[in-house]
Amino acid sequence: MQRSLDSLAGMATSAFGAGTSAAMRQATSPKTILEYIINFFTCGGIRRRNETQYQELIETMAETLKSTMPDRGAPLPENIILDDMDGCRVEFNLPGENNEAGQVIVRVSKGDHSETREIPLVSFEKICRALLFRCEFSLPQDSVILTAQGGMNLKGAVLTGANLTAENLCDADLSGANLEGAVLFMADCEGANFKGANLSGTSLGDSNFKNACLEDGIMCGATLDHANLTGANLQHASLLGCSMIECNCSGANMDHTNLSGATLIRADMSGATLQGATIMAAIMEDAVLTRANLRKASFISTNLDGADLAEANLNNTCFKDCTLTHLRTEDATMSTSTQTLFNEFYSENI
């Protein structure tokens, strides 16, 4: 009896106190020598049973929250009760009149027996909000609720056309997710992982992607006006036809990105690296590319009028049929071929 209550209390503490992949593995692994032996001879039967119970706990919690709260932004109830979890009653008591501990108290009971644990309030609330987020956007619940950094686990999520205006997606894992046509205006995506995600046609204006991973992302036709992409990883990303007016990409890794047809008027790309990038028919008037690494980048039919290339690395950079009037190239490093091109056709601007 006590071992069953203790196991369920441990699962509740792991699921709603951490919610990470490591916490799930720890909570569902065999605990005793006997369980390890049975698990071995049943080809993981103990772990599978525990994982099923863990998943049921999460899904029951999500449904309970959804039915008791008017919307996911509302305050969490002071008492959340899950009845009949494997014959047990699970109660979460949040800090308030009946709980002055400052932590969430978890009580698992069956008959006269009970087990109690404590969960940090901040972690508990973050996990509950993540469950409600999945409910709102009809995403199946996952046993891994949060990333190791504490962001939502939304790996591979389908969020096409979703309204995520001003959403907090810091440190979230959205790798491989489909956000085509979604609205993330003013969303906070600092440190988030969008590797391989589809962001085509998304509205990302005024959003924060500082230090985010957008590697291999498909962002064709996205709007990134005034967005913060400082330190972001955009390697091999497709930014065809993007609007990036006054976008801050300083220090970003944009190696081998495709910026063809993009509008980068007054964009700040200082200190960014664009090695091997393809930039065809883009508008980059007054763009700031100071100290940028443009080695082997290819600029074709691009308007760079008034762009600042001071101290930039232009070794083996290709400029073909570009508008290079009013350029600043002080202390820029360039190959002989590039220097010859500038001297021949644009000497008055050097």
Curated annotation (Swiss-Prot):
Family matches, as Pfam families: Pentapeptide, PipB2_N
Domain notes: Contains various tandem pentapeptide repeats in the C-terminal region. The pentapeptide motif is required to efficiently recruit kinesin-1. No position is completely conserved in these repeats, whose consensus sequence is A-[DN]-[FLM]-X-X. The C-terminal 38 amino acid residues, specifically, the C-terminal motif LFNEF, are required for peripheral localization of PipB2 and redistribution of lysosomal-associated membrane protein (LAMP). The N-terminal 225 amino acid residues are sufficient for type III translocation and association with Sifs and SCVs, but not accumulation in peripheral vesicles.
Protein name: Secreted effector protein PipB2
Keywords: Host membrane, Membrane, Repeat, Secreted, Virulence
Function (record text): Effector proteins function to alter host cell physiology and promote bacterial survival in host tissues. Involved in the reorganization of late endosome/lysosome (LE/Lys) compartments in mammalian cells. Necessary and sufficient to link kinesin-1 onto the Salmonella-containing vacuole (SCV) membrane. Required for centrifugal extension of lysosomal glycoprotein-rich membrane tubules, known as Salmonella-induced filaments (Sifs), away from the SCV and toward the cell periphery. Required for virulence, but not for intracellular survival and replication in phagocytic cells.
UniProt organism field: Salmonella paratyphi A (strain ATCC 9150 / SARB42)
Subcellular locations according to the entry: Secreted; Host membrane
SUBUNIT field: Interacts with the host kinesin light chain (KLC), a subunit of the kinesin-1 motor complex.
NCBIfam families tied to this protein: PRK15196.1
Domain Pentapeptide repeat: 162-201, 202-241, 247-286, 287-326
InterPro entries: 5peptide_repeat, PipB2_N
GO CC, alphabetical: extracellular region; host cell membrane; membrane
UniProt keyword annotation of Metal-binding present: no
